[in-house]
Amino acid sequence: MALTFKDIERVANLARLELRPDETEHTLSQLNGFFALVEQMQAVNTDGVEPLAHPAALLGEVALRLREDIASEPNQREASQASAPAVERGLFLVPKVIE
């Protein structure tokens, strides 16, 4: 995937950014470099490769200090929402700020 100068101008316009032509060219170069790197990584065959929890796990002698993913606090939803001005189905309701 390669972006064009027009793509950068369009995204800058949507983001309400004013870029000089040299900034647009620099951004185009950086983003295309990023996409090229992503394409290289996607091309690597990872079939049969076991995912690692942490790169240090490869070393073997390093003990990982990763804790179990267990909730350490009780669900406080009702208590947190007790003082809210508006709640619906467990969610805070806020005024619409974007038209």
From Swiss-Prot:
InterPro entries: Asp/Glu-ADT_sf_sub_c, GatC. Pfam families: GatC (PF02686). It comes from the Bacteria. Its EC number is 6.3.5.-. It is an enzyme of class 6 (ligase). One of its GO terms (molecular function) is glutaminyl-tRNA synthase (glutamine-hydrolyzing) activity. Disulfide bonds: none annotated. It catalyses: L-glutamyl-tRNA(Gln) + L-glutamine + ATP + H2O = L-glutaminyl-tRNA(Gln) + L-glutamate + ADP + phosphate + H(+); L-aspartyl-tRNA(Asn) + L-glutamine + ATP + H2O = L-asparaginyl-tRNA(Asn) + L-glutamate + ADP + phosphate + 2 H(+). Keywords: ATP-binding, Ligase, Nucleotide-binding, Protein biosynthesis. GO terms for biological process: glutaminyl-tRNAGln biosynthesis via transamidation; regulation of translational fidelity; translation. The keyword Iron does not apply. Belongs to the GatC family. Heterotrimer of A, B and C subunits. Allows the formation of correctly charged Asn-tRNA(Asn) or Gln-tRNA(Gln) through the transamidation of misacylated Asp-tRNA(Asn) or Glu-tRNA(Gln) in organisms which lack either or both of asparaginyl-tRNA or glutaminyl-tRNA synthetases. The reaction takes place in the presence of glutamine and ATP through an activated phospho-Asp-tRNA(Asn) or phospho-Glu-tRNA(Gln). This is Aspartyl/glutamyl-tRNA(Asn/Gln) amidotransferase subunit C.
